[in-house]
């Protein structure tokens, strides 16, 4: 009887380990704004509700607004839930991104490009490494991002960067140093978000202008989750670069699993608006990382 119980207990442990290491980031922890963030500009255009569990950015003719993380990080999992500007939002951009602060900077971007009433939002992502970007991908979302809060997150380790929308991977950027492509592995980044007027380019290449009669525009945020390796000194950077020390370094997070690849392919086939990897006019020879990222 004892042997049977032991076997059953072992099976339970194995099943639990499969659940924990299934290839998806840990479930975000809902925390208020002030735990991890602070205003970065135009604090008079930021509203804090319910003790900071909900935060609104306001855009009008006089100003937009933005906030940033208090700490810098090298690798981790970063997410927040957002409800985008509703109605006629042409010309308005809401951004959530990670960025280092130097000339040859690294950056991981979400940019939500507003549109005329009834037209879908476009989500543009981009990855800068060593100051080089030009890796734009644009998709439509499969839901209305103005009707409720949805999760947007980044998983970043030494192997790859994965960008998620509601746990669906919409982009993977793998470490392609072996192909001569730089990868962000030694420059800590802060997390930023902002709401601003970009009607010179955001909607139909700048043809659609912001309708200020609809101002103020509001983007709302909640669940300010940060689970990263803090790095403010060279010594801390070295510690964060020690592989295997954190959960995001484990084998399950070194690549997408089969289900995640199917979901990524679903996004590619049904919702892609633009992908730099397949823009032959711009890149007659696809950039080297595109094959490894399964974008072509």
Swiss-Prot record:
* Primary location group: secreted
* Site label Important for catalytic activity, positions: 109
Q: Do you know which Gene3D superfamilies this protein is assigned to? A: 2.60.120.200
Q: Which Pfam families match?
A: Glyco_hydro_16, XET_C
What are the binding positions for xyloglucan in this chain? 111, 124-126, 134-136, 200-201, 205, 282
Which residues does the record list as glycosylated?
Answer: 115
- Specify whether DNA repair is a keyword of the entry: no
* Compartment(s) of residence: Secreted, Cell wall; Secreted, Extracellular space, Apoplast
Tell me its EC number(s), please.
Answer: 2.4.1.207
InterPro entries, alphabetically?
Beta-glucanase/XTH (IPR044791), Beta_glucanase (IPR008264), ConA-like_dom_sf (IPR013320), GH16 (IPR000757), GH16_AS (IPR008263), XET_C (IPR010713), XTH (IPR016455)
Which Cys pairs does UniProt list as disulfide-bonded?
Answer: 229-240, 277-290
Biological process annotations from GO: cell wall biogenesis; cell wall organization; xyloglucan metabolic process
**Signal peptide start and end residues:** 1-22
Identify its protein family. Belongs to the glycosyl hydrolase 16 family. XTH group 1 subfamily.
**What protein name applies here?**
Probable xyloglucan endotransglucosylase/hydrolase 1
Organism per entry: Solanum lycopersicum (Tomato)
Q: What is the name of the gene encoding this protein?
A: XTH1
């Amino acid at each position: 009887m004892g042997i049977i119980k032991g076997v059953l207990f072992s099976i339970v442990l194995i099943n639990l380990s499969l659940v924990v290491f299934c290839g998806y980031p840990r479930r975000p922890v809902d925390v208020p704004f002030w735990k991890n963030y602070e205003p970065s500009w135009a604090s008079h255009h930021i509203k804090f509700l319910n003790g900071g569990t909900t935060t609104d950015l306001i855009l009008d003719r006089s100003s937009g607004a933005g906030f940033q993380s208090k700490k810098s990080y090298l690798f981790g999992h970063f997410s927040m839930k957002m409800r985008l500007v509703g109605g006629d939002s042409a010309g308005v951009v809401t951004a959530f991104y990670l960025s280092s602060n130097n000339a040859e900077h690294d950056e991981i971007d979400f940019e939500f490009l507003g549109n005329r009433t009834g037209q879908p939002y476009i989500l543009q992502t981009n990855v800068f490494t060593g100051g080089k970007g030009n890796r734009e991908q644009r998709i439509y979302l499969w839901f209305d991002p103005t009707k409720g809060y949805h999760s947007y997150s980044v998983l970043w380790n030494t192997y790859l960067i994965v960008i998620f929308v509601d746990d669906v991977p919409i982009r993977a950027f793998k470490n392609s140093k072996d192909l001569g492509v730089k990868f962000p592995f030694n420059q800590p980044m802060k997390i930023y978000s902002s709401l601003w007027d970009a009607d010179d380019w955001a909607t139909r290449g700048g043809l659609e202008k912001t309708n200020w009669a609809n101002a103020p525009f509001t983007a709302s945020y909640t669940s300010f989750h940060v689970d990263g390796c803090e790095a403010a000194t060279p010594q801390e950077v070295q510690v964060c670069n020690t592989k295997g020390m954190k959960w995001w370094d484990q084998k399950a997070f070194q690549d997408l699993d089969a289900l995640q690849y199917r979901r990524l392919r679903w996004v590619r086939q049904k919702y892609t608006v633009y992908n730099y990897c397949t823009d032959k006019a711009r890149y007659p020879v696809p950039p080297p990382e595109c094959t490894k990222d399964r974008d072509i």
